Design a protein with these regions (language model features):
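Non-catalytic DNA-recognition/assembly elements of restriction-modification systems
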Residues: 1-22
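DNA target-recognition patches
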Residues: 10-16, 26-61, 106
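Structural detector for helix-capping/boundary residues
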Residues: 7-12, 43, 101, 195
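Glycine- and charge-enriched low-complexity intrinsically disordered segments
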Residues: 117-136
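Amphipathic alpha-helical segments with low aromatic content
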Residues: 1-7, 150-151, 157-201
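A short glycine-rich beta-alpha junction/loop motif
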Residues: 31-32, 80, 96-104, 136-159
């Protein structure tokens, strides 16, 4: 096995926090249309669902004022306020949009780190930060870039990263498969119980 290399989070990805609150206000929102752009919110990261939507901005405003905050498939969004550290990768079929002030966009440098490995390492880092800085109360904001980027993590070679990533992917598949089977069994049990009760009546 190759030696693991120490890396800084600032080397592994490009990070962009959402715009200042005054850049996106409710007075700017418009109904969804061909001339609007979706605003991604914390609910998308927390619920791991890109289809959730509430607010839209005029396309011209988003393209001219919020270009730096746009979100594409493959980008990672992270919740930054309140419920912090929820991580979600935007899927291939997701709608184009921009992030609001409560999110951070992460673009992983996949030449040096596998995206799944990054997500695991980043999530662990946030959990450790929360644990060591909570002082008995909830952490309400993600670490500032000045603290986040210098944080160090051990990373294996890309070859080993891919092997580890594939292993986790298979485990996720099995968990999902067994979860679906469990739901089917529970539904069958409920149906049987109801059927027995009806017969007794």
């Amino acid at each position: 096995m190759n030696a693991w290399e120490q890396r800084k989070f600032g080397e592994l990805a490009e990070y962009k926090k959402g715009p200042f609150g005054s850049t996106i206000t409710k007075s700017m929102f418009v109904p969804k249309s061909d001339e609007s752009v979706k605003v991604y919110e914390q609910q998308n990261a927390i619920n791991k669902d890109s289809s959730l939507e509430r607010y839209f901005l005029p396309k011209e405003y988003a393209y001219t004022k919020l270009k730096a905050f746009e979100v594409h498939s493959g980008d990672i969004i992270v919740s930054c306020a309140g419920t912090i550290g929820e991580i979600y990768e935007i899927p291939d079929n997701a709608e184009y949009g921009v992030i609001n002030q409560a999110l951070m966009r992460v673009r992983v440098d996949e030449k040096i780190v596998d995206k799944r490995m990054f997500i695991i390492a980043f999530s662990n880092m946030i959990n450790e930060f929360t644990r060591t800085h909570s002082n008995g109360s909830a952490i309400k904001n993600i670490p500032p870039f000045a603290d986040l980027k210098p944080m160090k993590v051990l990373m294996p070679s890309m070859e080993e990263q891919k092997v580890i990533s594939e292993c986790f992917e298979k485990m996720d598949y099995l968990i999902t498969l067994h979860h679906r089977k469990l739901i089917c069994v529970k539904n069958a049990l409920k149906f049987t119980q109801n059927d027995i009760i009806r017969e007794k009546l």
